[in-house]
Structure formats: C-alpha cells, structure tokens
Amino acid sequence: MATTAVTLKDVCPQEFIATYARFLKKTGRVQIPKWNDIAKTATYRELPPTNPDWIYYRIATLARKVYIRGGDGVATYRRVFGGNRRNGVRPNHFADVNGGNIRYCLKQLQNLKVIETDAVKGGRTITATGRRDLDRIAKQIYDKKNKI
C-alpha cells in the first residue's frame, strides 16, 4: 500500500489543535509567562480562560493559522480572534483581542523555529522545518483515524 502525503489541511482542525497543544506541553519547550493564570484574552471578556492550558491551545491555533494564511501580522490575528463587546442595553460591537497575548504566542513559535518574520511583506510565514513538523503531526492524526 502506497503512503500518501498528508498535510495540515487534510485533518480536522480541532483534532490538530488539541494534539499539537498536548505536544507543546509535553515537550516543555514553550515558556509559560507568569501572567498566564490571571490574564484575560480580550478586554471585552469578563474572566480569564478557565482552561489552565489555554496558552498552548492559542499557540497551536496560531501555528495552524500561519500555516494556512501566511503573511499576516499581529493586527490581523487580533481581528481573527476578536468577538462581540457586550454593552449592556446598548447594541453589541466588534472588538479586537489583546495584542500582547498574540505577540507572545508568535514569539514562542519563532523561538521554536516554526515561523519567521517575512522581511519583504512583514507579518509571519511558516518555515520549512515548521511545515515539516506540523505535517508530521497531521500525518500521525490521519494514520490514527484511518487505521485499518
């Protein structure tokens, strides 16, 4: 039976993000900030995240988004993760998330050599080693799901 090339786009996003977050936590190469347990992800949120491993999931999500979109910067990802600001009896309005969390996660991915800053266009792009690593994890998920 011939092996097929599996990329990140061939697996379920939720499965990939959960698997990559577990991988990041298990390897211990990501430094968790001191403010991890008290920081809110956005100004319009009332409470910090309930999942103590939320930073790993945000890093995994950003790695996937950089792989798929590429060339986007912090401002774009602030809008991508944004949501509705609840204004009481007044109408809701869209609000961006905090840029510090996004910036920190992107720096951690740069330290892991998964992404790099695009010198020409700005923003972040996936590196060859980052593409290889993410595709390798996607292949493991694909093989486990399609096991005969």
From Swiss-Prot:
Xref: InterPro entries: Ribosomal_eS19, WH-like_DNA-bd_sf, WH_DNA-bd_sf
Keywords: Ribonucleoprotein, Ribosomal protein
Pfam families (alphabetical): Ribosomal_S19e
SMART domains listed in its UniProt record: Ribosomal_S19e
GO terms, molecular function: RNA binding; structural constituent of ribosome
The keyword Protease is annotated on this UniProt entry: no
Gene3D superfamilies membership: Winged helix-like DNA-binding domain superfamily/Winged helix DNA-binding domain
Cellular component terms per the entry's GO annotation: cytosolic small ribosomal subunit
Top-level taxon: Eukaryota
Cysteine pairings via disulfide bonds: none
Family: Belongs to the eukaryotic ribosomal protein eS19 family.
This protein's name: Small ribosomal subunit protein eS19
Organism, scientific name: Dictyostelium discoideum (Social amoeba)
Gene name linked to the record: rps19
